[in-house]
Amino acid sequence: VDGDGQHDPSYIPELVKLIEGGASLAIGSRFLVETDGFQSTFMRRVGIRWLSFLLELLTGKVVTDPTSGFRACNKDAIDLFCKSYPDDYPEPESIALAMKLGLPVMEAPVKMNERQGGRSSIGGFSSVYYMIKVTLAIVLVCWVHRGDK
C-alpha cells in the first residue's frame, strides 16, 4: 500500500484471497473493471498499456495494471524479491521476473484514489527515462530468464 492515499486499504482482503487461492503475487488493478475511482492521465494510461502489451508479448500472460504498487506477496515471491528486486521503478520489472520464474501472478479489481500528498516521481522528462528504462529492464529480465521455470 502506498503512503500517498491512492490505495484504499479496504481492498487488502481481496489481495489476500488471491494469495490464499494460489497466487504468489497479487496486484490491485484499476483496469480490470470500470470504476468511478481516480484514473491517471491519458499519457500515463498509454504508458501502462504499452507495458501491459510488452509483458504479454514476452511472457504470454496478461497484467492490466503493471505499474500498480498495491500488491501482496506470498513466501515464494518474498524469497525471490529478497534476492532480486529492482530499486528503480520496480513494479513492472518485478512482475516480469516473477512470471518468467513461474510464480503465479493474479490481479483483483480495486478503486484507486487521487494522490492525497506528495508528488509523482514520474513526470516531464523523467517519464521518457522511465519508459525507456522499464522497457529495457523487462526485455532484459525476460531474455535472461527465457528458459527458466
Per-segment meaning from a language model:
Residues V1, S29, K111:
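Conserved residues at the C-terminal ends of beta-strands
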Residues D2-Q6:
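The conserved acidic donor/metal-binding loop of glycosyltransferases
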Residues H7-D88, R115-I132:
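Acceptor/aglycone-binding surface of glycosyltransferases and processive sugar-polymer synthases
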Residues S10, G21, K133-K149:
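Terminal low-complexity segments of carbohydrate-biosynthetic enzymes
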Residues E20, E56-T59, K100, L140-V144:
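Residues at helix-coil transition
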Residues K61-V62, K83-P86, I95-N113:
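Catalytic donor-sugar/metal-binding loop of nucleotide-sugar-dependent glycosyltransferases
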Residues P92:
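DNA-recognition element of transcription regulators
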